[in-house]
């Protein structure tokens, strides 16, 4: 079934599937996207803090060496620091004087030995030109600057930290630091994206789409999960995105039943399909994309079972995406996905056919096959922060219930986070046949709802998951994910097979 046009992102308007492999995008930040809006973010965080005075102090990620080695751990900037600076450089610090609306970035002091071996660190002039800041200073002046601020501060002003152990290198009084409010304030600020952030996530998705397409074009020639992971990474790097938002999951066959499978080293053999969960990171912003497709030269599903489960998950995703708009409780969308899963598995006989959809839903048995939430925020982290998780309940009187590891239905209606315009969330339904989970389910009361003889036919599938990144707009949604799926993905496999046979 072809995905509804409404479920596609607009990023490839005018570009058909046959042309996507020839489409090379310019991913440099151009005239439409200015410098990273650090000052805007700082003001937003100060507003969430609800105070008019104080000094926010953040320390960036320092250079860290591997244990017992002279080699460094690959650098990854602390995301809270990046949100207030846009600086993807090690060994930096920043301060933001709330009363003066003054943002200062501290860069590493010049080190000749470092320059000879590793190249020069960023200079003051380069920092002022590159970043949306009011001032740039060398790190050696940090202690003097903060001490000077303390002498001039009012009695009600504090230095505001993310964590108690992130204190600046100064002599201090115990009551000088406030360490409880900055994390929730920054989480609330980061949950709703601005136009710059949306553009970065859109670009990350474009790169991911190109990489997923490259895999579809070559899947008929591949023999091992590592072939998939290697080509995906190579394609991302070629298009200006050398970092992945998370570890690539290239799970073939029953490995797809492990949600975060990352070994990526097994031969396909006679396996049916691949669950590829992989997303590029662009300028520190994540994409999160999952596609499931047959291991096939013909672009056809090898068995009715894997085809039927794919179509079930496809229905789950398409219906849920259409529900996305401001004011919707994401938990309600998750429950709709669960209900669709029950309906489909009941039709296939995986659930005993003498049971009703309502009875199965009330039992929580669907959690054996759909054990995770429908989605999460995406941003500077692949599982990004927000004032509240989209799957979180806020009503303590209605706790979630669990039965030996399985997340069950809510005991009663729950007050959960509402979607807001400019949030970006994933919609990633899945159906899985995990042998250990189902073995455990045999010992639970929910076993009476499951036909374990029928389940045997579905184990070779492992799992099917489809995942897109969805921007909440003023009136609904926009799908930022461009990676082909459904019939479009199968067509790419078919065309590539024809080209390969002619070569």
UniProtKB/Swiss-Prot annotation:
Cofactor binding comment, as recorded: Binds 2 manganese ions per subunit.
Binding site for Mn(2+) 2: 277, 288, 467
Keywords of this entry: Aminopeptidase, Hydrolase, Manganese, Metal-binding, Metalloprotease, Protease
Catalytic activity: Release of any N-terminal amino acid, including proline, that is linked to proline, even from a dipeptide or tripeptide
TM annotation in the entry: none
Cofactor(s) required for function per UniProt: Mn(2+)
Record-linked PROSITE patterns: PROLINE_PEPTIDASE (PS00491)
Protein's GO biological process: proteolysis
This enzyme's EC code(s): 3.4.11.9
A GO MF label: manganese ion binding
Similarity comment text for this entry: Belongs to the peptidase M24B family.
Protein name: Probable Xaa-Pro aminopeptidase TSTA_094700
Species of provenance: Talaromyces stipitatus (strain ATCC 10500 / CBS 375.48 / QM 6759 / NRRL 1006) (Penicillium stipitatum)
């Amino acid at each position: 079934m072809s995905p509804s046009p409404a479920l596609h992102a607009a990023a490839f308007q005018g570009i058909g599937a046959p042309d996507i492999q020839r489409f090379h995008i310019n991913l440099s930040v151009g005239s439409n996207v200015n410098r990273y809006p650090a000052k805007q973010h700082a003001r937003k965080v100060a507003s969430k803090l609800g105070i008019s005075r104080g000094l926010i102090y953040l320390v960036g990620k320092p250079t860290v060496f591997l244990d017992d080695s002279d080699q460094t751990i690959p650098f990854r900037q602390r995301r809270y620091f990046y949100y207030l600076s846009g600086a993807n450089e090690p060994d930096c610090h920043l301060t933001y004087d709330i009363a003066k609306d003054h943002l200062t970035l501290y860069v590493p002091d010049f080190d000749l030995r470092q320059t000879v071996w590793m190249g020069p660190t960023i200079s003051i002039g380069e920092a002022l030109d590159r970043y949306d800041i009011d001032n740039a200073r060398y790190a050696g002046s940090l202690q003097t600057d903060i001490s000077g601020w303390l002498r001039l501060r009012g009695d009600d002003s504090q230095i505001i930290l993310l964590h108690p152990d992130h204190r600046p290198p100064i002599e201090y009084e115990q009551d000088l630091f406030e360490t409880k409010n900055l994390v929730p304030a920054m989480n609330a600020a980061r949950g709703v994206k601005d136009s710059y952030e949306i553009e970065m996530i859109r670009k990350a998705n474009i790169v991911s789409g190109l990489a997923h397409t490259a895999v579809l074009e070559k899947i008929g020639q591949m023999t091992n999960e590592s072939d998939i992971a290697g080509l995906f990474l190579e394609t991302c790097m070629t298009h200006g995105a050398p970092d992945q938002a998370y570890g690539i999951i290239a799970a073939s066959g029953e490995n797809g039943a492990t949600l975060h499978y990352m070994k990526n080293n097994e031969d396909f053999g006679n396996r049916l399909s691949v669950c590829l969960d992989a997303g590029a990171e662009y300028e520190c912003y994540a994409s999160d994309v999952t596609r499931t497709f047959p291991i096939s030269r013909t672009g056809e599903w090898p068995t009715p079972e894997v085809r039927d489960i794919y179509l079930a998950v496809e229905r789950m995703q398409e219906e849920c995406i259409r529900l996305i708009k401001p004011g919707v409780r994401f938990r309600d969308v998750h429950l709709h996905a669960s209900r669709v899963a029950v309906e489909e598995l009941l039709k296939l006989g995986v659930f005993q056919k003498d049971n009703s959809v309502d009875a199965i839903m009330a039992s929580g048995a669907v959690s054996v096959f759909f054990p995770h939430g429908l989605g999460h925020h995406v941003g500077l982290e692949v599982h990004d922060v927000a004032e509240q998780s989209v799957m979180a309940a806020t009503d303590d009187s209605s706790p979630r219930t669990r039965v030996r590891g399985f997340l069950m239905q809510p005991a009663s209606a729950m007050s959960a986070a509402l979607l807001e315009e400019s949030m970006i969330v994933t919609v990633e339904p899945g159906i899985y046949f995990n042998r250990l989970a189902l073995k455990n389910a045999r010992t639970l009361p929910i076993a009476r709802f499951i036909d374990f003889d029928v389940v045997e036919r579905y184990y070779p599938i492992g799992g099917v998951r489809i995942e897109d990144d969805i921007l909440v707009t003023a009136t609904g949604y926009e799908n930022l994910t461009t990676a082909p799926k459904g019939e479009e993905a199968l067509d790419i496999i078919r065309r590539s097979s024809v080209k390969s046979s002619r070569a």
